[in-house]
Protein backbone atom coordinates (compact mmCIF):
# COMPACT_ATOMS: atom_id res chain seq x y z
CA UNK A 1 0.00 0.00 0.00
CA UNK A 2 2.72 2.43 1.02
CA UNK A 3 4.67 1.34 -2.04
CA UNK A 4 1.82 2.19 -4.31
CA UNK A 5 1.37 5.60 -2.72
CA UNK A 6 5.08 6.31 -3.07
CA UNK A 7 4.93 5.36 -6.76
CA UNK A 8 2.09 7.78 -7.42
CA UNK A 9 3.83 10.60 -5.55
CA UNK A 10 7.00 10.05 -7.58
CA UNK A 11 5.13 10.28 -10.85
CA UNK A 12 3.47 13.54 -9.75
CA UNK A 13 6.82 15.05 -8.84
CA UNK A 14 8.27 14.14 -12.24
CA UNK A 15 5.26 15.64 -14.06
CA UNK A 16 5.60 18.94 -12.12
CA UNK A 17 9.31 19.07 -12.90
CA UNK A 18 8.63 18.67 -16.64
CA UNK A 19 6.00 21.44 -16.59
CA UNK A 20 8.42 23.76 -14.82
CA UNK A 21 11.17 23.20 -17.41
CA UNK A 22 8.71 23.70 -20.25
CA UNK A 23 7.66 27.05 -18.78
CA UNK A 24 11.29 28.10 -18.35
CA UNK A 25 12.03 27.08 -21.98
CA UNK A 26 9.08 29.00 -23.34
CA UNK A 27 9.99 32.11 -21.36
CA UNK A 28 13.58 31.86 -22.57
CA UNK A 29 12.48 31.48 -26.19
CA UNK A 30 10.13 34.44 -25.86
CA UNK A 31 12.86 36.59 -24.32
CA UNK A 32 15.29 35.53 -27.05
CA UNK A 33 12.75 36.42 -29.71
CA UNK A 34 12.14 39.84 -28.17
CA UNK A 35 15.88 40.47 -27.90
CA UNK A 36 16.43 39.35 -31.48
CA UNK A 37 13.62 41.57 -32.73
CA UNK A 38 14.92 44.54 -30.78
CA UNK A 39 18.41 43.93 -32.08
CA UNK A 40 17.11 43.71 -35.65
CA UNK A 41 15.14 46.95 -35.33
CA UNK A 42 18.13 48.69 -33.84
CA UNK A 43 20.35 47.39 -36.61
CA UNK A 44 17.85 48.51 -39.26
CA UNK A 45 17.58 51.98 -37.76
CA UNK A 46 21.34 52.20 -37.51
CA UNK A 47 22.22 50.80 -40.93
CA UNK A 48 19.40 52.25 -43.11
CA UNK A 49 18.42 55.39 -41.26
CA UNK A 50 14.79 54.32 -41.05
CA UNK A 51 12.33 57.27 -41.04
CA UNK A 52 10.32 58.26 -38.11
CA UNK A 53 6.65 59.21 -38.61
CA UNK A 54 7.59 62.88 -38.84
CA UNK A 55 9.97 62.03 -41.65
CA UNK A 56 7.16 60.45 -43.73
CA UNK A 57 5.09 63.64 -43.98
CA UNK A 58 7.07 65.03 -47.02
CA UNK A 59 7.17 61.80 -48.96
CA UNK A 60 3.99 62.39 -51.09
CA UNK A 61 5.32 65.81 -52.14
CA UNK A 62 8.65 64.32 -53.12
CA UNK A 63 6.88 61.56 -55.05
CA UNK A 64 4.76 64.15 -56.93
CA UNK A 65 7.86 66.13 -57.85
CA UNK A 66 9.54 62.99 -59.06
CA UNK A 67 6.47 62.14 -61.14
CA UNK A 68 6.53 65.61 -62.71
CA UNK A 69 10.21 65.25 -63.62
CA UNK A 70 9.59 61.83 -65.13
CA UNK A 71 6.51 63.07 -67.02
CA UNK A 72 8.41 66.10 -68.33
CA UNK A 73 11.26 63.91 -69.46
CA UNK A 74 8.87 61.53 -71.17
CA UNK A 75 7.04 64.47 -72.79
CA UNK A 76 10.29 65.88 -74.09
CA UNK A 77 11.18 62.49 -75.48
CA UNK A 78 7.73 62.25 -77.09
CA UNK A 79 8.26 65.63 -78.78
CA UNK A 80 11.51 64.34 -80.19
CA UNK A 81 9.80 61.15 -81.33
CA UNK A 82 6.99 63.19 -82.94
CA UNK A 83 9.47 65.43 -84.76
CA UNK A 84 11.41 62.42 -85.96
CA UNK A 85 8.19 60.78 -87.16
CA UNK A 86 7.07 63.97 -88.94
CA UNK A 87 10.45 64.32 -90.63
CA UNK A 88 10.83 60.66 -91.59
CA UNK A 89 7.23 59.76 -92.40
CA UNK A 90 5.88 63.04 -93.80
CA UNK A 91 8.34 65.80 -94.69
CA UNK A 92 11.20 63.78 -96.14
CA UNK A 93 9.02 61.70 -98.50
CA UNK A 94 7.20 64.87 -99.62
CA UNK A 95 10.46 66.67 -100.27
CA UNK A 96 11.79 63.65 -102.14
CA UNK A 97 8.57 63.47 -104.16
CA UNK A 98 8.80 67.15 -105.10
CA UNK A 99 12.44 66.76 -106.03
CA UNK A 100 11.63 63.66 -108.04
CA UNK A 101 8.83 65.51 -109.86
CA UNK A 102 11.12 68.37 -110.82
CA UNK A 103 13.90 66.02 -111.90
CA UNK A 104 11.44 64.03 -113.98
CA UNK A 105 10.17 67.23 -115.60
CA UNK A 106 13.72 68.21 -116.48
CA UNK A 107 14.46 64.71 -117.79
CA UNK A 108 11.26 64.83 -119.83
CA UNK A 109 12.35 68.11 -121.38
CA UNK A 110 15.76 66.68 -122.19
CA UNK A 111 14.31 63.47 -123.60
CA UNK A 112 12.02 65.45 -125.91
CA UNK A 113 15.04 67.31 -127.21
CA UNK A 114 17.29 64.28 -127.53
CA UNK A 115 14.77 61.92 -129.12
CA UNK A 116 13.63 64.50 -131.65
CA UNK A 117 16.97 66.25 -132.19
CA UNK A 118 15.13 69.41 -131.26
CA UNK A 119 18.11 71.26 -129.90
CA UNK A 120 21.20 71.26 -132.09
CA UNK A 121 22.82 74.23 -130.38
CA UNK A 122 23.95 72.41 -127.27
CA UNK A 123 21.69 74.37 -124.94
CA UNK A 124 20.08 72.20 -122.26
CA UNK A 125 16.67 72.52 -120.66
CA UNK A 126 16.64 75.32 -118.06
CA UNK A 127 15.35 74.88 -114.53
CA UNK A 128 14.37 77.14 -111.64
CA UNK A 129 16.60 77.50 -108.58
CA UNK A 130 16.33 74.60 -106.08
CA UNK A 131 14.48 76.89 -103.62
CA UNK A 132 11.38 76.61 -105.84
CA UNK A 133 11.36 72.82 -106.23
CA UNK A 134 7.89 71.60 -105.26
CA UNK A 135 6.51 75.14 -105.06
CA UNK A 136 5.27 75.67 -108.63
CA UNK A 137 2.00 74.35 -110.01
CA UNK A 138 1.05 72.88 -106.61
CA UNK A 139 -1.78 73.40 -104.14
CA UNK A 140 0.05 76.10 -102.20
CA UNK A 141 -2.25 76.57 -99.19
CA UNK A 142 -4.19 73.55 -97.93
CA UNK A 143 -6.43 74.64 -95.05
CA UNK A 144 -9.84 73.29 -94.07
CA UNK A 145 -10.48 75.59 -91.12
CA UNK A 146 -9.15 79.13 -91.58
CA UNK A 147 -11.25 81.87 -93.12
CA UNK A 148 -10.06 82.24 -96.72
CA UNK A 149 -10.07 86.02 -96.39
CA UNK A 150 -7.70 85.85 -93.43
CA UNK A 151 -5.04 85.40 -96.11
CA UNK A 152 -4.16 88.67 -97.84
CA UNK A 153 -1.47 90.21 -100.07
CA UNK A 154 1.42 92.24 -98.72
CA UNK A 155 2.44 95.58 -100.16
CA UNK A 156 4.00 95.24 -103.60
CA UNK A 157 7.63 94.16 -103.43
CA UNK A 158 10.50 95.60 -105.42
CA UNK A 159 12.05 93.07 -107.80
CA UNK A 160 13.68 92.89 -111.21
CA UNK A 161 11.28 93.89 -114.00
CA UNK A 162 11.63 91.28 -116.73
CA UNK A 163 9.09 92.96 -119.07
CA UNK A 164 10.27 95.54 -121.65
CA UNK A 165 8.43 98.87 -121.66
CA UNK A 166 7.46 101.29 -124.46
CA UNK A 167 10.17 103.70 -125.55
CA UNK A 168 8.05 106.37 -127.27
CA UNK A 169 4.87 108.22 -126.48
CA UNK A 170 3.05 106.49 -129.35
CA UNK A 171 4.29 103.01 -128.50
CA UNK A 172 1.72 100.46 -127.37
CA UNK A 173 2.56 97.30 -125.43
CA UNK A 174 -0.48 95.23 -124.57
CA UNK A 175 -2.06 91.78 -124.07
CA UNK A 176 0.37 89.96 -121.74
CA UNK A 177 0.28 86.17 -121.58
CA UNK A 178 2.18 84.13 -118.98
CA UNK A 179 2.59 80.49 -118.00
CA UNK A 180 5.03 78.80 -115.63
CA UNK A 181 5.92 75.11 -115.37
CA UNK A 182 8.07 73.29 -112.81
CA UNK A 183 11.15 74.03 -114.91
CA UNK A 184 10.70 77.43 -116.61
CA UNK A 185 8.32 80.27 -117.40
CA UNK A 186 7.13 81.77 -120.69
CA UNK A 187 5.94 85.31 -121.36
CA UNK A 188 4.69 87.21 -124.41
CA UNK A 189 3.04 90.52 -125.32
CA UNK A 190 2.07 92.46 -128.42
CA UNK A 191 3.81 95.65 -129.56
CA UNK A 192 2.32 98.32 -131.84
CA UNK A 193 4.47 101.26 -132.87
CA UNK A 194 1.67 103.63 -133.83
CA UNK A 195 -0.83 103.42 -131.00
CA UNK A 196 -3.06 100.77 -129.46
CA UNK A 197 -5.89 101.23 -131.98
CA UNK A 198 -3.84 100.23 -135.03
CA UNK A 199 -4.81 96.72 -136.19
CA UNK A 200 -2.76 96.60 -139.38
CA UNK A 201 0.73 95.80 -138.10
CA UNK A 202 2.32 94.73 -134.84
CA UNK A 203 5.11 92.49 -133.64
CA UNK A 204 5.30 89.99 -130.82
CA UNK A 205 7.79 89.79 -127.94
CA UNK A 206 8.35 86.24 -126.63
CA UNK A 207 10.62 85.28 -123.71
CA UNK A 208 11.69 82.19 -121.77
CA UNK A 209 13.17 82.31 -118.27
CA UNK A 210 13.52 80.84 -114.80
CA UNK A 211 12.94 81.87 -111.19
CA UNK A 212 16.05 82.78 -109.21
CA UNK A 213 16.87 83.89 -105.68
CA UNK A 214 19.61 86.42 -105.08
CA UNK A 215 22.33 86.17 -102.44
CA UNK A 216 20.15 88.31 -100.17
CA UNK A 217 17.11 86.08 -100.69
CA UNK A 218 15.20 88.29 -103.12
CA UNK A 219 13.13 86.67 -105.85
CA UNK A 220 13.71 87.63 -109.45
CA UNK A 221 12.58 86.42 -112.87
CA UNK A 222 15.60 85.76 -115.05
CA UNK A 223 15.05 85.92 -118.82
CA UNK A 224 17.29 83.39 -120.60
CA UNK A 225 15.99 83.59 -124.18
CA UNK A 226 13.87 86.18 -125.95
CA UNK A 227 12.91 87.16 -129.47
CA UNK A 228 11.09 89.99 -131.22
CA UNK A 229 8.92 88.60 -134.01
CA UNK A 230 9.01 91.73 -136.16
CA UNK A 231 8.11 90.60 -139.68
CA UNK A 232 5.24 90.88 -142.13
CA UNK A 233 3.00 88.60 -140.04
CA UNK A 234 0.50 90.42 -137.83
CA UNK A 235 0.10 88.07 -134.87
CA UNK A 236 -2.70 88.91 -132.46
CA UNK A 237 -4.39 87.60 -129.32
CA UNK A 238 -1.43 85.30 -128.58
CA UNK A 239 -1.46 82.71 -125.77
CA UNK A 240 1.74 81.13 -124.45
CA UNK A 241 2.46 77.90 -122.56
CA UNK A 242 5.58 76.42 -120.95
CA UNK A 243 6.14 72.94 -122.43
CA UNK A 244 9.01 70.42 -122.30
CA UNK A 245 10.33 71.84 -125.58
CA UNK A 246 10.30 75.52 -124.63
CA UNK A 247 7.57 78.14 -125.03
CA UNK A 248 4.66 77.11 -127.26
CA UNK A 249 2.54 79.98 -128.58
CA UNK A 250 -0.81 80.11 -130.37
CA UNK A 251 -1.69 83.27 -132.33
CA UNK A 252 -4.21 84.48 -134.85
CA UNK A 253 -3.01 86.34 -137.93
CA UNK A 254 -5.24 89.29 -138.81
CA UNK A 255 -5.23 92.27 -141.17
CA UNK A 256 -8.74 93.55 -140.48
CA UNK A 257 -10.73 94.80 -137.52
CA UNK A 258 -12.45 92.39 -135.19
CA UNK A 259 -15.89 93.38 -136.46
CA UNK A 260 -14.80 92.86 -140.09
CA UNK A 261 -13.38 89.46 -139.21
CA UNK A 262 -16.69 88.31 -137.70
CA UNK A 263 -18.51 89.49 -140.81
CA UNK A 264 -16.26 87.47 -143.13
CA UNK A 265 -17.15 83.97 -144.36
CA UNK A 266 -13.88 82.17 -143.61
CA UNK A 267 -12.09 81.29 -140.36
CA UNK A 268 -9.18 83.36 -139.07
CA UNK A 269 -5.66 82.17 -139.82
CA UNK A 270 -3.92 80.66 -136.79
CA UNK A 271 -0.31 79.72 -136.17
CA UNK A 272 1.40 77.39 -133.67
CA UNK A 273 4.91 78.62 -132.83
CA UNK A 274 7.68 77.70 -130.42
CA UNK A 275 10.67 79.43 -128.87
CA UNK A 276 13.13 76.61 -128.13
CA UNK A 277 15.67 76.46 -125.35
CA UNK A 278 18.32 77.35 -127.94
CA UNK A 279 16.63 80.70 -128.61
CA UNK A 280 15.40 79.71 -132.08
CA UNK A 281 11.78 80.33 -133.06
CA UNK A 282 9.77 78.22 -135.51
CA UNK A 283 6.08 78.23 -136.38
CA UNK A 284 3.52 76.48 -138.54
CA UNK A 285 0.13 77.56 -139.85
CA UNK A 286 -2.78 75.43 -138.69
CA UNK A 287 -5.25 74.01 -141.20
CA UNK A 288 -8.08 76.26 -140.06
CA UNK A 289 -10.33 75.38 -143.00
CA UNK A 290 -10.66 71.91 -141.50
CA UNK A 291 -10.15 72.60 -137.79
CA UNK A 292 -12.45 75.65 -137.70
CA UNK A 293 -14.69 74.64 -140.59
CA UNK A 294 -17.81 75.96 -138.84
CA UNK A 295 -16.24 79.25 -137.72
CA UNK A 296 -16.02 82.74 -139.25
CA UNK A 297 -13.65 84.13 -136.61
CA UNK A 298 -11.39 82.34 -134.14
CA UNK A 299 -8.87 83.65 -131.61
CA UNK A 300 -6.68 82.30 -128.80
CA UNK A 301 -7.89 83.24 -125.34
CA UNK A 302 -4.88 85.50 -124.55
CA UNK A 303 -4.38 83.80 -121.17
CA UNK A 304 -1.72 81.14 -120.72
CA UNK A 305 -2.12 77.56 -121.89
CA UNK A 306 -1.22 74.38 -120.02
CA UNK A 307 0.78 71.24 -120.78
CA UNK A 308 -1.35 68.17 -119.93
CA UNK A 309 -0.89 64.55 -121.02
CA UNK A 310 1.77 65.26 -123.68
CA UNK A 311 -0.41 67.95 -125.26
CA UNK A 312 -0.62 71.72 -124.94
CA UNK A 313 -4.11 73.08 -124.25
CA UNK A 314 -5.30 76.58 -125.15
CA UNK A 315 -8.55 78.43 -124.59
CA UNK A 316 -10.03 79.75 -127.85
CA UNK A 317 -13.21 81.63 -128.77
CA UNK A 318 -14.86 83.19 -131.80
CA UNK A 319 -17.93 83.30 -134.03
CA UNK A 320 -19.77 80.32 -135.54
CA UNK A 321 -21.17 80.24 -139.06
CA UNK A 322 -24.94 80.58 -138.84
CA UNK A 323 -26.73 77.25 -139.35
CA UNK A 324 -23.48 75.26 -139.44
CA UNK A 325 -23.47 71.93 -137.52
CA UNK A 326 -21.58 73.51 -134.60
CA UNK A 327 -24.03 76.41 -134.52
CA UNK A 328 -27.14 74.24 -134.80
CA UNK A 329 -26.13 71.94 -131.94
CA UNK A 330 -25.96 74.96 -129.60
CA UNK A 331 -29.39 76.28 -130.59
CA UNK A 332 -31.67 76.78 -127.56
CA UNK A 333 -28.79 76.01 -125.20
CA UNK A 334 -28.03 78.55 -122.48
CA UNK A 335 -27.03 78.87 -118.85
CA UNK A 336 -27.91 81.44 -116.20
CA UNK A 337 -25.52 82.04 -113.31
CA UNK A 338 -26.80 83.99 -110.30
CA UNK A 339 -25.13 86.54 -108.05
CA UNK A 340 -24.66 85.66 -104.39
CA UNK A 341 -27.56 86.91 -102.28
CA UNK A 342 -28.72 89.24 -105.07
CA UNK A 343 -31.36 87.59 -107.24
CA UNK A 344 -32.45 89.01 -110.57
CA UNK A 345 -36.02 90.35 -110.19
CA UNK A 346 -37.02 89.75 -113.84
CA UNK A 347 -39.58 87.11 -114.78
CA UNK A 348 -38.03 83.71 -115.46
CA UNK A 349 -39.24 83.55 -119.07
CA UNK A 350 -37.70 86.94 -119.75
CA UNK A 351 -34.43 85.89 -118.12
CA UNK A 352 -34.28 82.81 -120.34
CA UNK A 353 -34.97 84.86 -123.46
CA UNK A 354 -32.24 87.35 -122.56
CA UNK A 355 -29.80 84.56 -121.65
CA UNK A 356 -30.25 82.97 -125.08
CA UNK A 357 -29.76 86.32 -126.80
CA UNK A 358 -26.53 86.94 -124.86
CA UNK A 359 -24.69 84.42 -127.09
CA UNK A 360 -25.49 86.47 -130.23
CA UNK A 361 -24.58 90.11 -129.52
CA UNK A 362 -25.38 92.68 -132.17
CA UNK A 363 -21.81 93.99 -132.29
CA UNK A 364 -20.69 90.94 -134.27
CA UNK A 365 -23.59 90.73 -136.68
CA UNK A 366 -25.63 88.31 -134.60
CA UNK A 367 -23.06 85.50 -134.87
CA UNK A 368 -23.03 83.00 -132.02
CA UNK A 369 -19.92 83.78 -129.95
CA UNK A 370 -18.63 80.41 -128.81
CA UNK A 371 -16.14 79.14 -126.23
CA UNK A 372 -13.80 76.30 -127.21
CA UNK A 373 -10.58 74.50 -126.22
CA UNK A 374 -7.79 73.55 -128.62
CA UNK A 375 -5.22 70.85 -127.81
CA UNK A 376 -2.08 70.15 -129.86
CA UNK A 377 0.38 67.29 -129.47
CA UNK A 378 3.75 68.51 -128.21
CA UNK A 379 6.47 67.10 -130.44
CA UNK A 380 9.28 68.41 -132.61
CA UNK A 381 6.67 68.81 -135.37
CA UNK A 382 4.60 71.94 -134.82
CA UNK A 383 0.83 71.91 -135.23
CA UNK A 384 0.66 68.13 -134.85
CA UNK A 385 -2.70 66.44 -134.27
CA UNK A 386 -4.80 69.49 -133.28
CA UNK A 387 -8.16 68.67 -131.68
CA UNK A 388 -10.91 71.22 -131.03
CA UNK A 389 -13.41 70.77 -128.18
CA UNK A 390 -16.60 72.85 -128.23
CA UNK A 391 -18.32 72.66 -124.81
CA UNK A 392 -22.12 72.96 -124.59
CA UNK A 393 -23.60 76.33 -123.75
CA UNK A 394 -25.51 74.67 -120.93
CA UNK A 395 -22.21 75.07 -119.04
CA UNK A 396 -20.39 78.05 -120.58
CA UNK A 397 -21.46 81.63 -121.09
CA UNK A 398 -20.87 83.56 -124.32
CA UNK A 399 -17.40 82.85 -125.73
CA UNK A 400 -14.64 85.13 -124.47
CA UNK A 401 -10.94 85.36 -123.74
CA UNK A 402 -9.71 82.78 -121.28
CA UNK A 403 -6.90 80.77 -119.72
CA UNK A 404 -6.18 77.10 -119.02
CA UNK A 405 -4.62 76.47 -115.59
CA UNK A 406 -3.24 73.37 -113.90
CA UNK A 407 -2.75 73.36 -110.12
CA UNK A 408 -1.80 70.05 -108.54
CA UNK A 409 -3.90 67.45 -110.32
CA UNK A 410 -6.75 69.88 -111.07
CA UNK A 411 -7.35 71.73 -114.34
CA UNK A 412 -9.43 74.88 -114.79
CA UNK A 413 -10.68 77.20 -117.53
CA UNK A 414 -10.98 80.88 -116.72
CA UNK A 415 -13.50 82.71 -118.90
CA UNK A 416 -13.45 86.51 -119.11
CA UNK A 417 -16.71 88.16 -118.07
CA UNK A 418 -17.47 89.64 -121.48
CA UNK A 419 -21.15 88.79 -121.13
CA UNK A 420 -23.61 89.81 -118.41
CA UNK A 421 -22.06 87.88 -115.49
CA UNK A 422 -19.50 90.05 -113.71
CA UNK A 423 -17.93 87.77 -111.03
CA UNK A 424 -14.83 85.77 -111.98
CA UNK A 425 -15.49 82.22 -113.23
CA UNK A 426 -13.29 79.13 -113.03
CA UNK A 427 -14.67 76.02 -114.74
CA UNK A 428 -13.20 72.71 -113.49
CA UNK A 429 -11.87 70.84 -116.52
CA UNK A 430 -11.18 67.16 -117.11
CA UNK A 431 -9.28 65.82 -120.11
CA UNK A 432 -9.57 62.49 -121.90
CA UNK A 433 -8.75 61.26 -125.41
CA UNK A 434 -7.41 64.66 -126.55
CA UNK A 435 -10.64 66.45 -125.61
CA UNK A 436 -11.79 68.43 -122.59
CA UNK A 437 -14.97 68.47 -120.52
CA UNK A 438 -16.00 71.53 -118.55
CA UNK A 439 -18.07 71.39 -115.36
CA UNK A 440 -20.16 73.91 -113.41
CA UNK A 441 -17.87 76.78 -112.42
CA UNK A 442 -16.59 78.17 -109.18
CA UNK A 443 -17.77 81.78 -108.90
CA UNK A 444 -16.20 84.57 -106.85
CA UNK A 445 -18.84 87.18 -106.17
CA UNK A 446 -16.51 89.93 -104.91
CA UNK A 447 -14.02 89.46 -107.79
CA UNK A 448 -15.87 91.59 -110.35
CA UNK A 449 -14.90 93.48 -113.49
CA UNK A 450 -16.14 96.86 -114.72
CA UNK A 451 -18.53 96.89 -117.66
CA UNK A 452 -20.91 99.01 -119.62
CA UNK A 453 -24.57 99.22 -118.58
CA UNK A 454 -26.57 96.93 -118.39
CA UNK A 455 -23.60 94.63 -117.71
CA UNK A 456 -21.72 96.74 -115.16
CA UNK A 457 -19.92 95.25 -112.14
CA UNK A 458 -23.09 95.05 -110.03
CA UNK A 459 -25.27 93.58 -112.82
CA UNK A 460 -27.43 90.63 -111.77
CA UNK A 461 -29.66 89.84 -114.77
CA UNK A 462 -28.98 88.19 -118.16
CA UNK A 463 -28.39 90.66 -121.00
CA UNK A 464 -26.69 90.87 -124.37
CA UNK A 465 -23.28 92.52 -123.92
CA UNK A 466 -19.70 92.58 -125.16
CA UNK A 467 -17.86 94.25 -122.31
CA UNK A 468 -15.65 93.60 -119.30
CA UNK A 469 -11.90 93.10 -119.10
CA UNK A 470 -9.52 90.14 -118.74
CA UNK A 471 -8.57 89.68 -115.03
CA UNK A 472 -7.93 86.03 -114.26
CA UNK A 473 -7.97 84.44 -110.77
CA UNK A 474 -5.30 81.95 -109.67
CA UNK A 475 -6.35 78.94 -107.51
CA UNK A 476 -4.57 79.46 -104.18
CA UNK A 477 -6.37 77.82 -101.23
CA UNK A 478 -7.73 74.27 -101.20
CA UNK A 479 -9.48 71.87 -98.87
CA UNK A 480 -7.58 68.68 -98.05
CA UNK A 481 -9.85 66.82 -100.48
CA UNK A 482 -8.48 69.10 -103.26
CA UNK A 483 -11.67 71.18 -103.59
CA UNK A 484 -10.92 74.81 -104.41
CA UNK A 485 -11.62 77.30 -101.58
CA UNK A 486 -10.05 80.59 -102.61
CA UNK A 487 -8.17 82.42 -105.35
CA UNK A 488 -5.77 85.33 -105.73
CA UNK A 489 -6.11 88.01 -108.37
CA UNK A 490 -5.85 91.66 -109.30
CA UNK A 491 -9.26 93.11 -110.14
CA UNK A 492 -10.30 96.49 -111.49
CA UNK A 493 -12.40 97.76 -108.61
CA UNK A 494 -14.70 99.96 -110.67
CA UNK A 495 -18.36 99.81 -111.65
CA UNK A 496 -18.12 100.84 -115.31
CA UNK A 497 -14.69 102.34 -116.03
CA UNK A 498 -11.40 100.42 -116.10
CA UNK A 499 -10.02 102.01 -112.96
CA UNK A 500 -8.54 101.19 -109.56
CA UNK A 501 -6.49 97.96 -109.86
CA UNK A 502 -6.40 96.12 -106.53
CA UNK A 503 -5.00 92.74 -105.46
CA UNK A 504 -6.74 90.47 -102.94
CA UNK A 505 -7.60 86.92 -101.92
CA UNK A 506 -11.19 85.90 -102.70
CA UNK A 507 -13.57 83.20 -101.53
CA UNK A 508 -16.93 82.53 -103.16
CA UNK A 509 -18.64 85.52 -101.53
CA UNK A 510 -16.09 88.03 -100.21
CA UNK A 511 -12.53 89.29 -100.40
CA UNK A 512 -9.61 89.94 -98.07
CA UNK A 513 -7.99 93.26 -97.29
CA UNK A 514 -6.66 94.66 -100.55
CA UNK A 515 -3.42 96.09 -101.89
CA UNK A 516 -4.02 98.95 -104.33
CA UNK A 517 -1.61 99.82 -107.12
CA UNK A 518 -2.20 103.52 -106.58
CA UNK A 519 -5.21 105.80 -106.23
CA UNK A 520 -8.74 104.80 -107.15
CA UNK A 521 -8.45 106.89 -110.34
CA UNK A 522 -5.55 104.85 -111.74
CA UNK A 523 -6.37 103.49 -115.19
CA UNK A 524 -5.61 99.85 -115.92
CA UNK A 525 -6.67 96.96 -118.15
CA UNK A 526 -5.68 93.28 -118.42
CA UNK A 527 -4.19 91.42 -115.44
CA UNK A 528 -2.97 87.82 -115.23
CA UNK A 529 -1.86 86.22 -111.96
CA UNK A 530 0.29 83.23 -110.98
CA UNK A 531 1.29 82.07 -107.48
CA UNK A 532 4.23 79.97 -106.27
CA UNK A 533 6.10 79.08 -103.10
CA UNK A 534 9.71 79.38 -101.95
CA UNK A 535 9.90 75.95 -100.32
CA UNK A 536 13.05 76.81 -98.38
CA UNK A 537 11.24 79.56 -96.44
CA UNK A 538 7.69 78.19 -96.88
CA UNK A 539 6.60 81.63 -98.11
CA UNK A 540 3.92 81.96 -100.79
CA UNK A 541 4.14 84.69 -103.42
CA UNK A 542 1.82 85.82 -106.21
CA UNK A 543 2.74 87.65 -109.40
CA UNK A 544 0.16 89.84 -111.12
CA UNK A 545 1.19 91.03 -114.57
CA UNK A 546 -0.94 94.12 -115.10
CA UNK A 547 -1.50 96.74 -117.79
CA UNK A 548 -1.18 100.06 -115.95
CA UNK A 549 -1.72 103.47 -117.56
CA UNK A 550 1.55 105.14 -118.55
CA UNK A 551 0.93 108.62 -119.89
CA UNK A 552 4.54 109.56 -120.72
CA UNK A 553 5.68 106.51 -122.70
CA UNK A 554 2.77 104.79 -124.39
CA UNK A 555 -0.80 104.30 -123.29
CA UNK A 556 0.02 101.33 -121.04
CA UNK A 557 3.01 99.86 -119.31
CA UNK A 558 2.91 96.17 -118.41
CA UNK A 559 4.12 95.80 -114.81
CA UNK A 560 4.87 92.54 -112.91
CA UNK A 561 3.43 93.19 -109.44
CA UNK A 562 4.83 90.84 -106.78
CA UNK A 563 3.24 90.26 -103.35
CA UNK A 564 3.72 87.83 -100.50
CA UNK A 565 0.61 86.11 -99.15
CA UNK A 566 0.25 86.84 -95.43
CA UNK A 567 -2.22 85.62 -92.81
CA UNK A 568 -4.08 87.59 -90.17
CA UNK A 569 -7.13 85.93 -88.60
CA UNK A 570 -10.19 88.09 -88.38
CA UNK A 571 -9.05 90.82 -90.79
CA UNK A 572 -11.44 91.52 -93.64
CA UNK A 573 -10.79 94.50 -95.90
CA UNK A 574 -8.39 97.38 -95.52
CA UNK A 575 -5.96 99.42 -97.58
CA UNK A 576 -2.36 98.35 -97.95
CA UNK A 577 0.48 99.78 -99.93
Swiss-Prot record:
It is found in: Virion membrane; Host cell membrane. This is Hemagglutinin-neuraminidase. Glycans are attached at residues 119, 341, 433, 481, 538. Gene3D superfamilies: 2.120.10.10. Its main location: virion. Homotetramer; composed of disulfide-linked homodimers. Interacts with F protein trimer. Interacts with host CG-1B; this interaction inhibits viral adsorption and replication rather than internalization. The gene is HN. GO terms for cellular component: host cell plasma membrane; membrane; viral envelope; virion membrane. Disulfide bonds join 172-196, 186-247, 238-251, 344-461, 455-465, 531-542. Mediates the viral entry into the host cell together with fusion/F protein. Attaches the virus to sialic acid-containing cell receptors and thereby initiates infection. Binding of HN protein to the receptor induces a conformational change that allows the F protein to trigger virion/cell membranes fusion. Residues 234-239 are annotated as: Involved in neuraminidase activity. It catalyses: Hydrolysis of alpha-(2->3)-, alpha-(2->6)-, alpha-(2->8)- glycosidic linkages of terminal sialic acid residues in oligosaccharides, glycoproteins, glycolipids, colominic acid and synthetic substrates. The chain crosses the membrane at residues 27-47. GO terms for molecular function: exo-alpha-sialidase activity; host cell surface receptor binding. Residues 124-152 are annotated as: Important for interaction with fusion/F protein. InterPro entries: Hemagglutn-neuramid (IPR016285), Hemagglutn/HN (IPR000665), Sialidase_sf (IPR036278). It is an enzyme of class 3 (hydrolase). The C-terminus (head domain) is involved in binding the cellular receptor. The keyword Metal-binding does not apply. Belongs to the paramyxoviruses hemagglutinin-neuraminidase family. It comes from Newcastle disease virus (strain Chicken/United States(TX)/GB/48) (NDV). It comes from the Viruses. Residues 1-26 are intravirion. Keywords: Disulfide bond, Glycoprotein, Hemagglutinin, Host cell membrane, Host membrane, Host-virus interaction, Hydrolase, Membrane, Signal-anchor, Transmembrane, Transmembrane helix, Viral attachment to host cell, Viral envelope protein, Virion, Virus entry into host cell. GO terms for biological process: symbiont entry into host cell; virion attachment to host cell.
Amino acid sequence: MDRAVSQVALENDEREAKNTWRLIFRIAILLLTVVTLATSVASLVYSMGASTPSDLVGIPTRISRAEEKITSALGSNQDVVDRIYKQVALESPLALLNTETTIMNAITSLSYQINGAANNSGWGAPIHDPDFIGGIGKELIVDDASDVTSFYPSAFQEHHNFIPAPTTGSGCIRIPSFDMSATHYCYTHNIISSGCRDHSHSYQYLALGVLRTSATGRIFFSTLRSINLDDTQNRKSCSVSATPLGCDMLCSKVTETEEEDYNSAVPTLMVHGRLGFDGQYHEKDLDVTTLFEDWVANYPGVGGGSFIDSRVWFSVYGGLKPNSPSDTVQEEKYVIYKRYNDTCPDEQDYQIRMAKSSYKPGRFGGKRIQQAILSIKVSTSLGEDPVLTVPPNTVTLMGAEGRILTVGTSHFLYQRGSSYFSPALLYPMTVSNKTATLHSPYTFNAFTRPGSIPCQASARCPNSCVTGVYTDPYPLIFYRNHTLRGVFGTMLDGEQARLNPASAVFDSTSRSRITRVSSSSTKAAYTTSTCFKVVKTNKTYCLSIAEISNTLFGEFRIVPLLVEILKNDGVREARSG
